[in-house]
Amino acid sequence: SIVGTWESINLNPTVIIYRSDKEYLLSIIYVSETTKQASPSTYEIQKDGSQYFIAPAPKRIYIDYDPAKDVLNLSSLGDYLRN
């Protein structure tokens, strides 16, 4: 299961994936450099054929998961390891 907290290996924002009713949600936790305040942006995980994605503007971010390595990949943010 990809549910959980994921840390970027490229120092991108932390990602949390969780289930709400019948859908899965992905929150990207942005932390302000100046105020150190965390502000999440939450998106519903959608499916297109066999691909999963979230759709923040301006383009989709595709989600790939390697269960053997337990590595999550977000198309524009790189690899994430389970925290």
Regions found by a protein language model. Give the residues of each.
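Edge beta-strand at a domain terminus
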Residues: 73-83
